[in-house]
Amino acid sequence: CRTATKLAAKLSGIYVERLVNEPSAAALAYQARHGFGDGTYMIVDFGGGTLDISIVDSFDSVMEILAVAGDNHLGGKDFNEAIAYYFCKENGIDMNPLSPDDKAIVYRLAEECKISLPTQPMAMMIANIGGKQLSLTLDNNKLIEVCSAVFERVASPVRKALHDSRLSIDDIDDIILVGGSCKMPTVRAFIEKITGKRPCTDIDPDTAIAQGAGIFAGIKDRNDKLQDII
C-alpha cells in the first residue's frame, strides 16, 4: 500500500519525502495536545467502511506499531443499514422490493438520523414511500439496540489487537478515537464498555490524522529525531 501510494504520487509529479502511517499520525496529534513523551495508545480508526484497531508505542522518539486488527467491511455504512432496515420493519414494509430511489431516500434519512443524534436527544425520520407517509423516532438507547450486531463486531478487533500486542488494557495509557463513526456517543460509550477505559474525547476524530501528519512534517523540517516504524 505504501509502495502504491508513493508510485501514485510520483506519477502525479508529487515528491514524497516520507510517508507516515495513520496510527502514528493520530498518536502525534494526541501528544501535541497532551505532551510529547513515552506512552502506549490504542488507536480506534472507525470510518465509513472500515474499522482498524492499532496498538502504538511511543518510546524515545520512536513510534512503533505493536499490533493491528480490524474489519475491512465494517463502518458507518453498517449503522446506516441497520437503521434503514429498522425503519422499514417498524413501518411494516420490506426494504428489498423498494425502488432504487426509495432505498436511497431511506438510507439518506438513516444517515442523517445517525449524524444528528450526537447533538440532540432524539432524531426523527419522515419519508413518503409508495405514496405513504412513514416515520420513526430514535434516541441513543434505541440506536444501541437497533445496531447491537454492529457494535458486537467492533469488540472482536479490539480484543485481538490487545491479544496480539501481548498487552492488557491496563498497559494502555489512552484510547484515541479517529474517523467519523467515532463521533457517535454510542460508539465512544461502547469502546469504554468493552475496555473499561474512557477514551480521549478532546481530539477531533475528523482531523486527528491530518493534524498528526502536519506535526510529523514540522518535526522533520526542524530535523528533530523521530522515527516511524511499521
Predicted regions and their residues:
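Oxyanion-binding/catalytic loops of NTP- or PPi-dependent enzymes
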Residues: C1-I230
